[in-house]
Amino acid sequence: MSIARITMMEYLSEKDVVASENFYQTIQKDWFGNAQAIINVRTGPTSLLSLAVYSSYADAESNLPKRKEFQGIVKDKFTIVDSFYYEGDITDFEASKAKEIKAEWKN
């Protein structure tokens, strides 16, 4: 069963959110390439929610060292105020209109 890891991050400024997202784009495939899907959502001017889907708990745990490294970088370099995550089994998933989803990347 696939699992989801939901990470919440709160930054000091909107500038830090943008810089962190830009940095994330440069490492995502190398550091978190084992994710089946990743959706990042700006939940406010200084906050970000990241939803990552993995094939199993073992697969999700395999990138925890890189996640810890990423969290350290964003804490020091981009002034992250708070960060925590939840994870659990995916109990329902509907993506019949996945091709209609539009993502806008802001630099």
Language model features by range: what are they?
Residues 1-49, 55-69, 76-107:
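Short S/T/G/P-rich N-terminal loop/turn motif that feeds into the first structured element of a domain
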